[in-house]
Amino acid sequence: MKNINPTQTAAWQALQKHFDEMKDVTIADLFAKDGDRFSKFSATFNDQMLVDYSKNRITEETLAKLQDLAKECDLAGAIKSMFSGEKINRTENRAVLHVALRNRSNTPILVDGKDVMPEVNAVLEKMKTFSEAIISGEWKGYTGKAITDVVNIGIGGSDLGPYMVTEALRPYKNHLNMHFVSNVDGTHISEVLKKVNPETTLFLVASKTFTTQETMTNAHSARDWFLKAAGDEKHVAKHFAALSTNAKAVGEFGIDTANMFEFWDWVGGRYSLWSAIGLSIVLSIGFDNFVELLSGAHAMDKHFSTTPAEKNLPVLLALIGIWYNNFFGAETEAILPYDQYMHRFAAYFQQGNMESNGKYVDRNGNVVDYQTGPIIWGEPGTNGQHAFYQLIHQGTKMVPCDFIAPAITHNPLSDHHQKLLSNFFAQTEALAFGKSREVVEQEYRDQGKDPATLDYVVPFKVFEGNRPTNSILLREITPFSLGALIALYEHKIFTQGVILNIFTFDQWGVELGKQLANRILPELKDDKEISSHDSSTNGLINRYKAWRG
């Protein structure tokens, strides 16, 4: 991968000039000038997904200049580097190969000259065998009863991805009850343990090193709770499995290493749901549906790695994001799924994007003088409409939005879905085109009211519009289409990281807080006053000690 400061490229300079021409052009102007705009600025993927990016403040010239930027930053070379197993995560000297985990073509992918696919397939086969034994009831707990509940204990990528996917694919789930514990706050594990029976519960401990503080604290509490009922430590092996690479620590915990599912250092945490970390997904929806999830992602991988930039969906979405973030000064992006099963999708890509591209140092080790990753947030529609859409419509911040919805619902109850989708379509239209003062006044006239007598309220009913959106319409949310959608966003994030010259696949920003927490923890063991920190931290610790009693 080349390390190119994007602001020093000819394309960036051209974009800056182009922005001066575009900054006052409205989306309404663009549609008025081109009645065929939708067909030019939308694309369908695999007859499963329609991406409409026509309601953006862009022209064909904008996209051409953004694609020039991608070329100058050697995006094509970076894509080849990732897919070929080059160690593009240079700060940790690791390859980045989540694409290998879903490589359904089985073409060899090499790391240090060794094809990783045989190992990937071996772990998948092991996950299949294990999950089938649990789901069928063949696997028995220590009292001879079948498993009814699965508790996934992990944090970050070991929790967010599996939780998001099992929720999104709830229509495909079997009889097993799924629970997820992540927070080191004892409330989280306590509340889950109240719901389950030690005789019929399987715990999955998801930690690559088997040393993650939050995960291992929760795992030991789960083990203690289990042994209060089971008594004999030998029973742990029937009720705990590990998603890890530390066989020694797994064995010491009491887990049979035959039930340890490994993954590799070329699997980043926030890209790990495709690996053994996805065992909870397999247990929830079955192995065949998990393979469909992998297949959908693989189809998007092929699209991303082989399609020219001008038709490449992850690249187009990435470039449009850079346009807003760096030229219009938009600091955030909202992800708004109009599907209640997708209620964790925005949270998942909040981590996916912000932990990947929330960096202020470039690949050369220099502090950047441009914007890198945006703030990602969002909630399902229509809930968000009654919460924060006010600011998106009439606030002073530009918030580019991705609206996501399925054409076919899993719950065809009365006319619910038509009402939901009418809101989905209406919101992007309202954001793009707004409502002028003239229209507001005419509405008053149509009601038999004199606008002049209502002058005081008219300005508050005006919508400027010109708020940009993408619309992603899925035929239906299935394991395949969800896999493709997740991969679409993953590759968008990668593309932005390449162009913005940052390392997308490390996360050093999480380390300092952990180091300081490890230093502070021993100081909380007694009641002595602390004076070893700044006055604020000392004051907080000392008040905590006084209040806890």
UniProtKB/Swiss-Prot annotation:
Location of the protein in the cell: Cytoplasm
GO CC terms in record: cytosol
Modified residues (N6-acetyllysine): 80, 228, 234
Keyword annotations: Acetylation, Cytoplasm, Gluconeogenesis, Glycolysis, Isomerase
Entry keyword annotation includes Cytoplasm: yes
One BP annotation, GO: glucose 6-phosphate metabolic process
Enzyme class name: isomerase
Recorded metabolic or biological pathway in which this protein acts: Carbohydrate biosynthesis; gluconeogenesis; Carbohydrate degradation; glycolysis; D-glyceraldehyde 3-phosphate and glycerone phosphate from D-glucose: step 2/4
GO function terms (MF aspect): carbohydrate derivative binding; glucose-6-phosphate isomerase activity; monosaccharide binding
EC number: 5.3.1.9
Lineage: superkingdom: Bacteria
Active site, UniProt feature: 355, 386, 514
Keyword RNA-binding applies: no
Catalytic activity field: alpha-D-glucose 6-phosphate = beta-D-fructose 6-phosphate
Membership in a protein family: Belongs to the GPI family.
Purpose: Catalyzes the reversible isomerization of glucose-6-phosphate to fructose-6-phosphate.
UniProt-listed HAMAP family: G6P_isomerase
Protein's UniProt name: Glucose-6-phosphate isomerase
Organism the protein comes from: Shigella flexneri serotype 5b (strain 8401)
Name of the gene encoding the protein in the UniProt record: pgi
